[in-house]
Amino acid sequence: MNDKLEWFAQNADKLQTLIDHFQIRETIEAYVHACDRCDRDAVAATYHEDSFDYHGEISNPGHVYASVVVDALKTKWESCTHHLGQSRIKVTGDSAGAETVFYATQLRKEDGVTMLDQQVGRYIDTLERRDGIWRFRLRRCTMEWGNSAPLGDSFVDVGAYLQPHRSPADASYEILGLSEGSSFIER
């Protein structure tokens, strides 16, 4: 038993780094989940009160950005799905820098035609841990490329599957134990 305690004591810094990386990635994932579900309060919950988001044409304090982006997602697109790639994270005490690759797809109507919008970019984030929770202090978005094209016919009967909801009525909220405005999974 003492060997285990000794091992934990010797590796406490490494274990804390793993925990920090996990919690930071969880914040990044909570943000895109909230955007895809159009949950304004859950998007806002990933930002500190004094945060700022530079998202190209939409740049605002984090809590204002949450409202602006959710309104845009609801009015312009019928669906939105973010896919996250690798994250590079450097933690220094209660501050961290993170770079995360994203691929986003959206569907919208244009003159009666369903259009597929695609973007690939990176989130360049500064996060801070306050009261034990990692949130964005500064979020900057790069855009590597974007594309828009008519969506072809589906090879699968989408209607035969569990239907998504762009709200907390989505099945993910129940299975993850989330409530409206809550983007973080309870630990």
Regions from the PLM with identified roles:
Residues 82-84, 118-123:
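Short, surface-exposed coil-to-beta transition loops
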Residues 14, 18, 56, 114:
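Charge-dense, low-complexity intrinsically disordered segments
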Residues 39-107:
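A solvent-exposed, acidic/Ser-Thr-rich amphipathic alpha-helical stretch
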Residues 1-33, 37, 41-45:
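Short, low-complexity N-terminal intrinsically disordered segments enriched in polar/charged residues
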Residues 77, 105-116, 146-147:
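Short, cysteine-centered beta-strand-loop-beta hairpins and adjacent loop/turn segments enriched
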Residues 2-4, 97-99, 120-160:
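Short beta-strand edge/turn micro-motifs at domain boundaries
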Residues 144, 156-187:
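A hydrophobic membrane-anchoring alpha-helix module
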